[in-house]
Amino acid sequence: MADSGTAGGAALAAPAPGPGSGGPGPRVYFQSPPGAAGEGPGGADDEGPVRRQGKVTVKYDRKELRKRLNLEEWILEQLTRLYDCQEEEIPELEIDVDELLDMESDDARAARVKELLVDCYKPTEAFISGLLDKIRGMQKLSTPQKK
């Protein structure tokens, strides 16, 4: 199971806690390879593991991420209805919300979405107007430029 040659370091399994301890069972710990992050010039840091905030939530507001996730779930739900199929069977199309937010007007946005849904045999007007309502006021999630 453990391969010390992997980029993430070796995985070490600790024995399960004794009976009656209420512990969850065996735990897996990852050991960094020599010279990995966390080791300074003076050797290994003795401070123990440091919990870091995820990269995505550092760059973006959690509230905006939640709004975007809810929007994506809504889009998937609507597309399964429009194409009358399961999520896995939806034709390959990408509705890029950031691209839509970059456009000057709702008319341009609507035209772009209509262009993407050209193969849909059901009416798309309700979906398009709902999508435009939902993205109104959203912020782009493009990667911020470093200075």
Curated annotation (Swiss-Prot):
Sites bearing Phosphoserine, chain numbering: S21, S32
Tissue expression profile of the protein: Ubiquitous. Expressed at low levels.
Region feature (Disordered): 1-55
GO molecular function: protein serine/threonine phosphatase inhibitor activity
Keyword Coiled coil: yes
InterPro entries, per the entry: CPI-17, CPI-17_sf
Residues bearing PTM Phosphotyrosine: Y29
Cellular component, GO annotation: cytoplasm
Post-translation changes: Phosphorylated primarily on Thr-57 by PKC (in vitro). An unknown Ser is also phosphorylated by PKC (in vitro).
UniProt superkingdom: Eukaryota
Main location: cytoplasm
Keywords from the UniProt entry: Acetylation, Coiled coil, Cytoplasm, Phosphoprotein, Protein phosphatase inhibitor
Coiled coil: 61-103
N-acetylalanine PTM positions: A2
Residue(s) carrying Phosphothreonine: T57
Record's keyword annotation contains Membrane: no
Pfam family, one: PP1_inhibitor
UniProt-annotated location(s): Cytoplasm
GO biological process: innate immune response
PANTHER family: PROTEIN PHOSPHATASE 1 INHIBITOR POTENTIATED BY PROTEIN KINASE C, PROTEIN PHOSPHATASE 1 REGULATORY SUBUNIT 14B
Biological role: Inhibitor of PPP1CA. Has over 50-fold higher inhibitory activity when phosphorylated.
Name of protein: Protein phosphatase 1 regulatory subunit 14B
Lineage, opening ranks: Eukaryota, Metazoa, Chordata, Craniata, Vertebrata
